[in-house]
Amino acid sequence: MADSIFPVLGAWWRSKGARQGDGATLPAGASTTPYDSAAMPVGSRKFTFEIDYRDTSESRLDLRVNWFNDNKVKVNGPFDITTVTLPQGQTKVVAEVELPASTAPRWLPSIAVPTSSGEAAISSLKVYETPVKAQPVFVWDGVREGAATITVWDGAREVPASIEFQA
């Protein structure tokens, strides 16, 4: 679980509903989005939404994208990415999404509660770039390439690790 790249949901603009601490209660037909100054670079285009909510009744959320230029001025949107269901009887949903193709360098999420859905009572929302899955590591022994296992010593035992190169 990473920290969110956007302000807490309660600080976002809302068409309807009310702030509830760091979260918000959003009735059917409501939408919410961070203010334009929070527009972030699109990066890898893959993001994770972690939604903690109260499970009083099932509801749905449309996860959407708004596109921005480098001056954090909205270019267009919102455009639907996916719909997630917040099932009754649970309190957390995690959705991994890929932003659709666009030449815009920045984006903001937007969340809408469809008019046919129940109220969404979200206590916490985190949005962060989806971590890259660890790739296999290979080494060259001078004759052939072979798989390698990377570990580090924590003072008591070897612990699996991974290597990530950043350009």
Predicted feature descriptions by range:
Residues Q20-V42, K74-P78:
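Secreted extracellular polysaccharide-interacting domains
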Residues A2-K16, E96-E98, A112-D154, I163:
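Extracellular polysaccharide-targeting segments
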Residues E58-F68, W107-P109:
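Beta-strand acidic-aromatic groove motif in beta-rich domains, primarily in extracellular
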Residues K74-A104:
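Extracellular carbohydrate recognition and processing domains
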Residues K72, A156-R157:
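Residue-level signal for glycine
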Residues F49-I51, P105-P114:
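Extracellular beta-strand-rich recognition modules
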Residues T33-L61, V94-V97, L125:
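Extra-cytoplasmic beta-strand recognition segments
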